[in-house]
């Protein structure tokens, strides 16, 4: 089944986006770092975006891209002769990722296996493509179940859309021309179960996941602060633990605890193709949005 598409409301009607076009650029993003507030219609199997309010818009979300977004770079430079991107008929795909929060305020990240063609060894939240006939939340919950084995009982979770990320792979032009172009919708799904209760039910899909971990706000803040593409790293707390508890899958199908060096999670995207494990840039953005959500809830007293 064909992947769902991202549509933009540019001249009064929804239009598909060509693969090579920068979605942020089409929506009026300048040369700044963003994010840019974007009006969204969250429809079955598709996402309609506009920089202005429109009938049917159900949310206003921050849209962001990395400072080194290859589509933004391609917008600024002439295409060299013989340089080919995917066919003009191919659009921008829609992905969804679930930031699963336990009742004790930790979130689940999974490490993609080293054998995957796209983004191997990256730490990301569970997620993937939305099918054309799926509600976006249903697509996120399906991906959560397929990757982690977790099914959340109806009535025992709440959810809210967090933000949008323009994603490319390879992530930098210095790695090669992009072959994949997505808008990823990050959904915060808040479970009524604790981390311990959720962990007892996790059954990771070894074809996609090689390890998983739960991050609390302190480590998440440090990870989110290591912004890819910045010249000077932000000041990091001196009291960060040297390692983070992780569960790694073994080749025989079992699992074992692993103390992952915290420094691994603080790596940024290198200038040349590299499959060393790190947290994806989009995930850092999503963690920032999650921490902002926690802060608002704390101020509201809820």
From Swiss-Prot:
One GO cellular component term: peroxisome
Highest taxon, organism lineage:
Eukaryota
Record has Manganese as a keyword: yes
Disulphide linkage map: none
What are the names of the required cofactors? Answer: Mg(2+); Mn(2+)
Q: What is its EC number?
A: 3.6.1.62
Q: Where are the transmembrane segments?
A: none
Q: Does the keyword Magnesium apply?
A: yes
Q: Which GO terms describe its biological process?
A: NAD catabolic process; NADH metabolic process; NADP catabolic process
User: Where along the sequence does the record place the motif called Nudix box?
Assistant: 128-149
InterPro entries annotated for this entry? NAD-cap_RNA_hydrolase_NudC, NUDIX_hydrolase-like_dom_sf, NUDIX_hydrolase_dom, Nudt17_dom
Pfam families attached here? NUDIX
The alphabetized UniProt keywords are: Hydrolase, Magnesium, Manganese, Metal-binding
State the top-level EC class. Answer: hydrolase
Q: Which GO terms describe its molecular function?
A: metal ion binding; NADH pyrophosphatase activity
The residues that the entry says bind Mg(2+) are 143, 147
Q: Which reaction does it catalyse?
A: a 5'-end (N(7)-methyl 5'-triphosphoguanosine)-ribonucleoside in mRNA + H2O = N(7)-methyl-GDP + a 5'-end phospho-ribonucleoside in mRNA + 2 H(+)
Q: What does this protein do?
A: Acts as a decapping enzyme capable of hydrolyzing monomethylated capped RNAs (in vitro). Hydrolyzes monomethylated capped RNA after alpha and beta phosphates to form N(7)-methyl-GDP. Shows low activity towards unmethylated capped RNA.
Matching PANTHER family: NUCLEOSIDE DIPHOSPHATE-LINKED MOIETY X MOTIF 17, NUDIX HYDROLASE, NUDC SUBFAMILY
Q: Which family does it belong to?
A: Belongs to the Nudix hydrolase family.
Q: Would you tell me the protein name for this molecule? A: m7GpppN-mRNA hydrolase NUDT17
Q: What gene is it encoded by?
A: NUDT17
